[in-house]
Amino acid sequence: MIERYPEQSLAKMYQRPDPKWDSYMWANQDWYNDSEGFVIPQNKVIDLTASLSSDGTLTWNVPEGDWIISCLKMKTTGVTNTPATPEATGLEVDKMSKQHVNTHFDAYMGEILRRIPEADRKSLKIVVQDSYETGSQNWTDDMLERFIKAYGYDPLPYLPTLYGKVVGNEDMSSRFLWDLRRLIADGVSYDYVGGLRDICHQHGLTTWLENYGHWGFPGEFLQYGGQSDEISGEFWNFGDLGLIENRCASSCGHIYGKKRIWAESCTSGGPNFTNYPANMKARIDRFFTEGINASLLHLYIHQPYEDRNPGMSAWFGSDFNRKNTWFSQMDLFTDYLRRSNFLLQQGTYVADVAYFIGEDTPKMTGSIDPQLPKGYSFDFINAEVFLTRAVVKDGHLTLPDGMKYRLLVLPNQKSMRPEVLGRISELVHDGLAVYGEAPEYSPSLSGYPEVDKEVSRIGTELFANDHYGKGRVFQRGIVLQDVLDALNIHPDFRCGKDMPVLFIHRTLPDAEIYFVSNQHNERVVFNGEFRVSQEFSPELWNPVTGEIRYLPDFKSKEGYISLPVELEGNESAFIVFRKNNKLTETKDNFPQKVTVCKINTPWRITFEAGKRGPETPVVWSQLKDWMNSENDSIKYFSGQAVYETTFKYSIYNRLLLNIL
């Protein structure tokens, strides 16, 4: 019996939201000889389909011996789409068939399009594909034919492996199941995502996709997302969701040339009405540094009632709606997001390292093995991009849209198909540096067993020495920092070992843009070193206020510009380097704030009417938290209040009010 054959055939998937990168990679199974006849020779499997009548009667002259007759049928998974209105609820579409995807589109989107005159479709532009949450599938109408086309051998003799039987030997059976999983991943990518994109384009629409899945995602996250027009990650205000999804999206966007990397942002469950911009910001900034540059706030629920507060809500999502008590001031928050999104969409992302995710499927994240030292950035990359988009220029793995990587890290595994390994070998020969170990065999049954000799030959040749053609070869086991040093790749950003500061870097022909984020609640002061040439000079672009100012205190040395940086708790800033800076110079990078006046006069507070607060203004001698009030109408008040007081002060160019 094949170990864990339900998982290997995708008849059962890990029911967890974040399967590890190696969840569908299995160690070689301990095996026994065939003395008891448990292994089925592939030439003993007979196809009886032609002997089956339309009424289900099997007519067959059975040869001598003991035979097992198996009947394999295709049926729906039984999964229905959700959430959906009753009228729009039905079985999930076959995601490995463009024909069925087109039919699904016509029955749903087509009906909407037919009801809206073309002249009135000004706001209907995008078809959204949310995260994959519908379970797997492992078959489609023409599965046998497409299998033969993809791999060059007939899969029918190996079908008993779908219910755990060993055909040929354990290795051959496992390889067949590997081919099956890979074919499913390809089908879901090209027929579902690509098919929906194609039919949308025919109707003047584009697609927007979250390229990861929970509860049965059968695809490969990079290839899957690469077929969509636009790509998105996701993060919640708390918990682990977002820790892999946003890197999934940004890597996909970078290697497939998508300018905008969206994120379903600030989704949440749990305690109601506890989210507000200040406690969302650090998490937003964190995922900005992972490549997100287009924020889609989750969510705004339509509010049909004027007299009901806090209005209609749901168990999921932050309440970005007009019934929220801070909605009237939300422009401060959205302006910060808009400014950040704009700058993070400029130029090209800077990354030194590309981690190859391997070819095994299903897969919705890659492996960062070994860990990348602090101060460097990376992307995940897949086989499709090697085969169709990648070339080497000046020692960099270069993609058509401008992305460049100096070092390719191979996954810690022994298998790779010869066409992929051969392409990597060509790239290294042309000047790329690679880190890893020589693959020894193919994971596929296609071309078996001769294909293993080809993989071993290419791998041995590539990893025989520390140079291959124009490229460099580094064996797994060498400390990665030593590899980067040998290639003269210095950290892109340095700020001290223990600083809680994250960064991302984007480059333009005439500017370098760094986004830096303090992830702690306390103020930090550090000397930032940026890998920027000396013809540039630094500016601070404040995404909260829109202020742009020159930073006069900096030094240029050995490929870096260093300058003192100060960030308040959870503050973020853009450090932009430009040539020929013409901004007005200031004396200090971060002028110190000086207390010029203390307000000791009483405060008159008027609470918003209709929110169950005090009906008349109250007077406090000093400011305090409403939650500490003994007056319940203040303690539990949810709304806005106007504070008024009088005080004397001298005239200054700029004053800040600190009410903490």
Name each region found by the language model.
Residues 658-660:
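Membrane-proximal, cysteine-centered motifs at transmembrane boundaries in secretory-pathway
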Residues 1-124:
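Mature N-terminal, pre-catalytic/accessory segment of carbohydrate-active enzymes
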Residues 1, 12, 18, 112-126, ...:
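Carbohydrate-binding surfaces of carbohydrate-active enzymes
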